[in-house]
Protein backbone atom coordinates (compact mmCIF):
# COMPACT_ATOMS: atom_id res chain seq x y z
CA UNK A 1 0.00 0.00 0.00
CA UNK A 2 1.50 3.30 -1.07
CA UNK A 3 0.97 6.33 1.11
CA UNK A 4 1.62 9.77 -0.33
CA UNK A 5 4.77 11.35 1.02
CA UNK A 6 2.99 14.62 1.80
CA UNK A 7 0.41 12.88 3.98
CA UNK A 8 3.09 10.89 5.80
CA UNK A 9 5.11 14.07 6.37
CA UNK A 10 2.06 15.88 7.75
CA UNK A 11 1.37 13.04 10.18
CA UNK A 12 5.01 13.07 11.30
CA UNK A 13 4.83 16.82 11.91
CA UNK A 14 1.65 16.31 13.93
CA UNK A 15 3.39 13.61 15.97
CA UNK A 16 6.15 16.05 16.89
CA UNK A 17 3.44 18.55 17.83
CA UNK A 18 1.84 15.95 20.10
CA UNK A 19 5.16 15.26 21.83
CA UNK A 20 5.87 18.97 22.36
CA UNK A 21 2.34 19.58 23.61
CA UNK A 22 2.65 16.87 26.27
CA UNK A 23 6.15 17.98 27.23
CA UNK A 24 4.88 21.51 27.79
CA UNK A 25 1.96 20.25 29.86
CA UNK A 26 3.87 18.10 32.32
CA UNK A 27 6.90 20.31 32.96
CA UNK A 28 6.68 22.93 35.76
CA UNK A 29 8.16 25.70 33.63
CA UNK A 30 5.19 27.51 32.12
CA UNK A 31 5.85 30.78 33.98
CA UNK A 32 8.39 32.08 36.47
CA UNK A 33 7.10 34.06 39.45
CA UNK A 34 9.00 36.33 41.83
CA UNK A 35 7.58 37.21 45.24
CA UNK A 36 8.17 40.45 47.14
CA UNK A 37 10.44 38.69 49.64
CA UNK A 38 12.68 37.49 46.82
CA UNK A 39 11.48 33.91 46.62
CA UNK A 40 11.11 32.50 43.11
CA UNK A 41 9.25 29.54 41.72
CA UNK A 42 8.30 28.01 38.41
CA UNK A 43 4.67 27.17 37.70
CA UNK A 44 3.37 24.66 35.18
CA UNK A 45 -0.09 23.50 34.23
CA UNK A 46 -0.12 20.64 36.72
CA UNK A 47 2.79 21.33 39.07
CA UNK A 48 4.71 24.22 40.63
CA UNK A 49 8.21 24.04 42.12
CA UNK A 50 10.34 26.44 44.12
CA UNK A 51 13.68 27.42 42.68
CA UNK A 52 16.55 26.08 44.75
CA UNK A 53 18.32 29.40 45.23
CA UNK A 54 15.69 30.79 47.62
CA UNK A 55 13.31 27.85 48.06
CA UNK A 56 11.49 27.11 51.28
CA UNK A 57 13.68 24.14 52.05
CA UNK A 58 16.94 25.82 51.08
CA UNK A 59 19.39 24.82 48.41
CA UNK A 60 19.64 21.09 47.83
CA UNK A 61 23.17 19.65 47.74
CA UNK A 62 24.59 19.19 44.29
CA UNK A 63 22.22 21.65 42.58
CA UNK A 64 22.95 24.99 40.99
CA UNK A 65 21.30 28.33 41.57
CA UNK A 66 18.13 28.84 39.56
CA UNK A 67 17.38 25.15 39.10
CA UNK A 68 14.02 23.65 39.97
CA UNK A 69 13.93 21.82 43.29
CA UNK A 70 12.03 18.66 42.45
CA UNK A 71 11.75 17.83 46.15
CA UNK A 72 9.76 20.98 46.92
CA UNK A 73 6.92 20.88 44.41
CA UNK A 74 3.18 21.26 44.70
CA UNK A 75 0.61 19.52 42.53
CA UNK A 76 -1.82 21.89 40.84
CA UNK A 77 -5.27 21.06 39.53
CA UNK A 78 -8.46 22.61 38.23
CA UNK A 79 -9.25 25.85 40.03
CA UNK A 80 -5.91 26.11 41.86
CA UNK A 81 -5.58 29.64 43.21
CA UNK A 82 -2.04 29.19 44.52
CA UNK A 83 -0.71 29.86 41.02
CA UNK A 84 -1.57 33.52 41.49
CA UNK A 85 0.27 34.61 44.64
CA UNK A 86 0.67 38.38 44.23
CA UNK A 87 -1.14 38.42 40.91
CA UNK A 88 -4.90 38.46 40.56
CA UNK A 89 -5.83 34.97 41.72
CA UNK A 90 -9.05 34.90 39.72
CA UNK A 91 -7.32 35.91 36.49
CA UNK A 92 -4.44 33.47 36.87
CA UNK A 93 -6.82 30.66 37.82
CA UNK A 94 -8.85 31.31 34.67
CA UNK A 95 -5.71 31.42 32.52
CA UNK A 96 -4.38 28.10 33.75
CA UNK A 97 -7.77 26.37 33.72
CA UNK A 98 -8.33 27.50 30.14
CA UNK A 99 -4.87 26.34 29.10
CA UNK A 100 -5.32 22.96 30.81
CA UNK A 101 -8.60 22.39 28.98
CA UNK A 102 -7.17 23.47 25.63
CA UNK A 103 -4.08 21.33 26.16
CA UNK A 104 -6.18 18.23 26.86
CA UNK A 105 -8.43 18.82 23.84
CA UNK A 106 -5.40 19.37 21.60
CA UNK A 107 -3.77 16.18 22.89
CA UNK A 108 -6.94 14.21 22.17
CA UNK A 109 -7.31 15.73 18.69
CA UNK A 110 -3.69 15.04 17.73
CA UNK A 111 -3.99 11.48 19.05
CA UNK A 112 -7.17 10.94 17.03
CA UNK A 113 -5.35 12.12 13.92
CA UNK A 114 -2.55 9.63 14.52
CA UNK A 115 -5.04 6.80 15.13
CA UNK A 116 -6.89 7.73 11.94
CA UNK A 117 -3.64 7.47 9.99
CA UNK A 118 -2.92 4.03 11.46
CA UNK A 119 -6.45 2.81 10.74
CA UNK A 120 -6.05 3.94 7.16
CA UNK A 121 -2.97 1.76 6.79
CA UNK A 122 -4.99 -1.27 7.89
CA UNK A 123 -7.15 -0.97 4.78
CA UNK A 124 -10.55 -0.12 6.25
CA UNK A 125 -13.10 0.82 3.55
CA UNK A 126 -13.86 4.31 4.88
CA UNK A 127 -10.30 5.04 6.00
CA UNK A 128 -8.23 3.75 3.11
CA UNK A 129 -5.50 6.00 1.66
CA UNK A 130 -7.47 6.14 -1.58
CA UNK A 131 -10.44 7.67 0.25
CA UNK A 132 -10.58 11.44 0.52
CA UNK A 133 -12.38 11.13 3.87
CA UNK A 134 -9.16 9.73 5.33
CA UNK A 135 -7.20 12.91 4.71
CA UNK A 136 -10.14 15.14 5.63
CA UNK A 137 -10.52 13.44 9.02
CA UNK A 138 -6.84 13.92 9.84
CA UNK A 139 -6.86 17.52 8.64
CA UNK A 140 -9.91 18.28 10.79
CA UNK A 141 -8.28 16.74 13.87
CA UNK A 142 -5.02 18.64 13.41
CA UNK A 143 -6.85 21.89 12.69
CA UNK A 144 -8.93 21.46 15.86
CA UNK A 145 -5.76 20.97 17.89
CA UNK A 146 -4.25 24.13 16.42
CA UNK A 147 -7.43 26.12 17.05
CA UNK A 148 -7.80 25.20 20.72
CA UNK A 149 -4.11 25.79 21.41
CA UNK A 150 -4.41 29.29 19.98
CA UNK A 151 -7.38 29.94 22.29
CA UNK A 152 -5.41 28.76 25.32
CA UNK A 153 -2.25 30.66 24.46
CA UNK A 154 -4.12 33.90 23.81
CA UNK A 155 -5.19 33.97 27.47
CA UNK A 156 -1.55 34.53 28.42
CA UNK A 157 -1.14 37.64 26.28
CA UNK A 158 -1.41 39.66 29.48
CA UNK A 159 0.46 38.61 32.62
CA UNK A 160 1.25 40.38 35.86
CA UNK A 161 4.44 42.29 36.70
CA UNK A 162 5.75 39.45 38.88
CA UNK A 163 5.35 36.77 36.23
CA UNK A 164 7.45 35.92 33.18
CA UNK A 165 6.68 33.33 30.53
CA UNK A 166 9.04 30.36 30.53
CA UNK A 167 10.20 27.81 27.97
CA UNK A 168 7.24 25.43 28.38
CA UNK A 169 4.94 28.15 27.06
CA UNK A 170 7.14 28.68 24.01
CA UNK A 171 7.30 24.91 23.57
CA UNK A 172 3.51 24.88 23.37
CA UNK A 173 3.61 27.70 20.82
CA UNK A 174 5.86 25.49 18.71
CA UNK A 175 3.38 22.62 19.08
CA UNK A 176 0.59 24.93 17.91
CA UNK A 177 2.55 26.02 14.85
CA UNK A 178 3.40 22.44 13.94
CA UNK A 179 -0.24 21.36 14.26
CA UNK A 180 -1.21 24.24 11.99
CA UNK A 181 1.46 23.22 9.48
CA UNK A 182 0.28 19.60 9.48
CA UNK A 183 -3.32 20.64 8.87
CA UNK A 184 -2.29 23.08 6.14
CA UNK A 185 -0.31 20.40 4.31
CA UNK A 186 -3.27 18.02 4.30
CA UNK A 187 -5.74 20.73 3.28
CA UNK A 188 -3.47 21.80 0.42
CA UNK A 189 -3.24 18.19 -0.74
CA UNK A 190 -7.04 17.78 -0.61
CA UNK A 191 -7.68 20.98 -2.54
CA UNK A 192 -4.99 20.12 -5.08
CA UNK A 193 -6.63 16.77 -5.71
CA UNK A 194 -10.03 18.40 -6.10
CA UNK A 195 -8.68 20.90 -8.62
CA UNK A 196 -7.33 18.05 -10.70
CA UNK A 197 -10.69 16.31 -10.68
CA UNK A 198 -12.71 19.47 -11.30
CA UNK A 199 -10.92 20.21 -14.56
CA UNK A 200 -13.31 20.41 -17.53
CA UNK A 201 -13.67 17.33 -19.63
CA UNK A 202 -11.43 17.20 -22.66
CA UNK A 203 -13.48 16.36 -25.74
CA UNK A 204 -11.84 15.65 -29.08
CA UNK A 205 -14.27 16.14 -31.94
CA UNK A 206 -13.81 13.93 -34.94
CA UNK A 207 -13.09 15.64 -38.22
CA UNK A 208 -15.85 13.59 -39.80
CA UNK A 209 -18.37 15.78 -37.97
CA UNK A 210 -17.63 18.56 -40.42
CA UNK A 211 -18.91 16.36 -43.21
CA UNK A 212 -22.56 15.80 -43.94
CA UNK A 213 -24.50 13.85 -41.39
CA UNK A 214 -24.39 10.14 -42.04
CA UNK A 215 -26.20 7.45 -40.11
CA UNK A 216 -23.92 5.43 -37.89
CA UNK A 217 -21.29 8.16 -37.52
CA UNK A 218 -19.30 7.60 -34.33
CA UNK A 219 -18.06 10.55 -32.28
CA UNK A 220 -14.55 10.26 -30.86
CA UNK A 221 -14.06 11.83 -27.44
CA UNK A 222 -11.67 11.58 -24.53
CA UNK A 223 -12.71 12.37 -20.96
CA UNK A 224 -10.50 13.32 -18.05
CA UNK A 225 -9.66 10.44 -15.65
CA UNK A 226 -11.50 12.14 -12.77
UniProtKB/Swiss-Prot annotation:
Protein name, entry field: Transmembrane protein 204
Q: What InterPro entries does the record tag this protein with?
A: TMEM204
Q: What residue intervals traverse the membrane?
A: 6-26, 104-124, 137-157, 171-191
The job of this chain, per UniProt, is described as:
Can influence paracellular permeability. Appears to be involved in cell-cell interactions through adherens.
Q: Where in the cell is it found?
A: Cell junction, Adherens junction; Cell membrane
Q: Please cite one Gene Ontology biological process associated with this protein.
A: regulation of vascular endothelial growth factor receptor signaling pathway
Glycosylated at which positions? 164
Question: Extracellular topology: which positions?
Answer: 27-103, 158-170
Q: How does it sit in the membrane?
A: Multi-pass membrane protein
State the species of origin: Rattus norvegicus
Q: Which residues lie on this side of the membrane: Cytoplasmic?
A: 1-5, 125-136, 192-226
Could you state one GO cellular component term attached to this entry? adherens junction
- Alphabetic keyword roster: Cell junction, Cell membrane, Glycoprotein, Membrane, Transmembrane, Transmembrane helix
Amino acid sequence: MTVQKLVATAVLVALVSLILNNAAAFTPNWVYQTLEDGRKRSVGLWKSCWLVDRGKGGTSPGTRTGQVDTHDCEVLGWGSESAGFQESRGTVKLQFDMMRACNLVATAALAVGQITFILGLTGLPLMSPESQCWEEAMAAAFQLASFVLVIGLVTFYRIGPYTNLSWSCYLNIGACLLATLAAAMLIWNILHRREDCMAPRVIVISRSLTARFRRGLDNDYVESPC
